Amino acid sequence: MTQLNDLPLQSLQFYATAPYPCSYLPQRQARSQVATPGHLIQSDIYSDLVTKGFRRSGMFTYRPYCDGCQACTPLRIVVDGFRPDRSQKRAVARHGKLQTRVLRLCFVPEHYQLYLRYQNGRHAGGGMDHDSIDQYTQFLLQSRVNSRLVEFREVDDTGATGGPGVLKMVSLLDLLDDGLSAVYTFYEPEPRCSYGTYNVLWQIAQARALSLPHVYLGYWIAVSPKMNYKAGFHPHEILTDGRWHRVDMPL
């Protein structure tokens, strides 16, 4: 367990939740360690917590605290030295013409409708496919840290259609002291698309432009098919036994 006795983390308290069904491994129970009080967790403290394996969901800052299981491994991409592989290059070729717009956190009905299509198309029956506007807002639009929404739109090359273009993807990210943190991304559930991969590549490019060394992808679970893609970005680092360990691309 990472030590949390360094200032300013001494001002925080940490408690463990009751067990609840694991979202990633069937037949498993999960627990989380939650950092409180929330009003003290501003951008600087949150940046420190992320380096120690914490994430946030809305206003809650947490990390896995499961009994007898350590499958969730924090993973961050090392921006300096990153080189895309063939499949990642194909994602850029497929989606590289998407136009982006960065927004402060705000409710946009078009985003919410895309979110519902994504949940129903990619995670039907997962419990989020019928989220209300309030649930969506609490999950994605509440933050005490430096957060942004990023729109990705497909625009007609001819410009004949006018307007902002067709919304294809929305990403929520946090700006940390040492990188970007990919909080959540949802997109049009089209067959043979690579929106998720392209989004990570876009964040790597943004981090490089901002001279930030890392892109945090949250938790990687080696035995979860949903999480396998995270380990495909090299070099990356994983947090084990309280220390970050580098993983380079296999030869």
Swiss-Prot record:
It comes from the Bacteria. InterPro entries: Acyl_CoA_acyltransferase, Asp_Glu_LeuTrfase, N-end_Aminoacyl_Trfase, N-end_Aminoacyl_Trfase_C, N-end_Aminoacyl_Trfase_N. Pfam families: ATE_C (PF04377), ATE_N (PF04376). It is found in: Cytoplasm. Its EC number is 2.3.2.29. It is an enzyme of class 2 (transferase). Coiled coil: none annotated. Keywords: Acyltransferase, Cytoplasm, Transferase. Disulfide bonds: none annotated. It catalyses: N-terminal L-glutamyl-[protein] + L-leucyl-tRNA(Leu) = N-terminal L-leucyl-L-glutamyl-[protein] + tRNA(Leu) + H(+); N-terminal L-aspartyl-[protein] + L-leucyl-tRNA(Leu) = N-terminal L-leucyl-L-aspartyl-[protein] + tRNA(Leu) + H(+). GO terms for cellular component: cytoplasm. GO terms for molecular function: arginyl-tRNA--protein transferase activity; leucyl-tRNA--protein transferase activity. SUPFAM superfamilies: Acyl-CoA N-acyltransferases (Nat). Its main location: cytoplasm. GO terms for biological process: ubiquitin-dependent protein catabolic process via the N-end rule pathway. Belongs to the R-transferase family. Bpt subfamily. PANTHER family: ARGININE-TRNA-PROTEIN TRANSFERASE 1, ARGINYL-TRNA--PROTEIN TRANSFERASE 1. Functions in the N-end rule pathway of protein degradation where it conjugates Leu from its aminoacyl-tRNA to the N-termini of proteins containing an N-terminal aspartate or glutamate. NCBIfam families: PRK01305.1-1, PRK01305.1-3, PRK01305.2-3. HAMAP family: Bpt. This is Aspartate/glutamate leucyltransferase. It comes from Verminephrobacter eiseniae (strain EF01-2). The gene is bpt.
